[in-house]
Amino acid sequence: MTVTTIHEQLLEIITPVIRSFDLELWGMDFIQGGKAVLRIYIDGPDGVTIDQCATVSRHIGLALEVEDIIAGAYNLEVSSPGLERPLFSAAQLAAYKGHKAELVLRAPCAQFPGRKKFTGVVGNVEGENFTLQIDPLKGGDNLQEELSAHWDDVKKARLIYDFDSEKGQKR
């Protein structure tokens, strides 16, 4: 069975379980090899609690046992995506326009030869195309540049939370 097929089958099983608790699937990572890891991120309008993660984990675990699509032993992890949440789609990226993010591309792009990792502020997102106002490299010039890319070029993406912006604020 291909990874894509397993990924699709996992989504078919876990999505209804998560929705039954009025939560949404934020994203999923399935890492094979050695002891496989199925990492599921869930979210809700008011975030999620540890108890909700534990309950969803138990129900997903039971559903996966019945379907038996993961060969061999695996670890199941269910959690909130957190403040520095991974991003799994251009639509998720679009919701964070103006926020800082870190992206790793699958391959260096022609625009920045030899470079795959970028940190900067999310710019415009139109469909699967997006821009990122790149932070200047340390030791380089201070020119701010813009990366233009397609979501399919992204290997990994996550938000970067600015903890300094919270200093001095009353809670």
UniProtKB/Swiss-Prot annotation:
Q: Which GO terms describe its cellular component?
A: cytosol
Superkingdom is Bacteria
Q: Where in the cell is it found?
A: Cytoplasm
Q: What Pfam families does its record include?
A: DUF150_C, RimP_N
A GO biological process of this protein is: ribosomal small subunit assembly
Query: InterPro entries under this entry?
Result: Ribosome_maturation_RimP, RimP_C, RimP_C_sf, RimP_N, RimP_N_sf
Secretion signal, residue range per the UniProt entry: none
**Keyword annotations of the record:** Cytoplasm, Ribosome biogenesis
- Identify the Gene3D superfamilies for this entry: RimP-like superfamily, N-terminal
Where would you say this protein principally sits, based on its record? cytoplasm
Supply the HAMAP family for this chain.
RimP
The family note in this entry says: Belongs to the RimP family.
Functional description taken from the UniProt entry:
Required for maturation of 30S ribosomal subunits.
> This protein is called what?
Ribosome maturation factor RimP
Q: Give the organism, scientific name.
A: Oleidesulfovibrio alaskensis (strain ATCC BAA-1058 / DSM 17464 / G20)
Q: What is the lineage of its organism?
A: Bacteria, Pseudomonadati, Thermodesulfobacteriota, Desulfovibrionia, Desulfovibrionales
